[in-house]
Amino acid sequence: MSLVPYFFELSGEHPSLPLADAYGCCAAECDGFRLSASGPGYAVLGFEPGKLGGIASRLALTRRLGRYLGSSSLDGSSSLAADLELPSGTVAVRVRRFQGCNDGIDLNRLAAKIGGIVARDRKVDLTSPDVELGLFVSDRVHFYLREAEIDRSQFEARKVAERPFFSPISLHPKFARAVVNMTFAPRGGTLLDPFCGTGGILIEAASIGVKVCGSDISPTMVDGCIRNMEHFQLPYERMEVADIGDIGSVFGRVDAVATDPPYGRATSTMKEPLGELYDRAMGSISEVLDR
């Protein structure tokens, strides 16, 4: 199996979740993959090129990704650029800095310098280029081919205010998607949310082709979750009113579990002490997992 390195331009919205999200997507989509490097705002993961589309379609906390070409210091960037073997066609150089890293580097000058090198034998097209060369300024200058950009507006379209049934206590869809990805749930596999609430996690799982089951001790929440799934025209396997202790007998074995459990404030624990509820939940979840 030949693994090709890909550069992930992470969102930087959390210190560790973006990397975990990218790693989870690769684990779910690939028979084999490898994390070879990571740093401020980026990760390099190797996988088969045919898996790129599937990985990109489920990412939540990555902005862009594509074939990794190499990294250098500012002084070494010209040499690296001169040695690149880019695909044929018009080219554009896109430069981005991660959160103030290497702030002494002038991004416009860097773009002009590298653009002048890679465009010596081809035309520049800044509007609709055949090849987009990404330069990501972080701990070093990282070069990659921009091959996929994540449509993050999709998460805004599914946020709480856009649902017919909602609770003010709910994960933002992009973080709900990241939680799903971190379970390594494969497309076609079954994911259970035993505290489904309004269905935010199940919505994100179903939207990437994972089969979903949900339960909640509140009939109102289960009905509302079904309304939300139907609103977004997403399929579900089963939705049940069930106590966390009964999920094994209700659902049997599943491939993954993802949930946002009650916090004991605005959400209901049916007067059960939070610690006891969590202890029961961990026991029940371990019983239903297939791995």
Pin down the residues of each PLM region.
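Short, charge-rich binding segments
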Residues: 82-86, 124-126, 136
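A short glycine/small-residue-enriched secondary-structure motif
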Residues: 58, 87-88
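Class I S-adenosyl-L-methionine-dependent methyltransferase catalytic core
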Residues: 1-65, 71, 75, 99-100, ...
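Short secondary-structure capping/junction motifs at helix and strand boundaries
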Residues: 90-92, 119-129
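An N-terminal amphipathic alpha-helical segment
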Residues: 72-87
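Phosphate-coordination loops involved in phosphoryl transfer and adenosine-cofactor binding
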Residues: 88-90, 188
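Active-site periphery "cap/insert" segments of enzyme catalytic domains
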Residues: 114-116
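Active-site nucleophile-His-acid catalytic modules used for acyl/amide transfer and hydrolysis
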Residues: 96
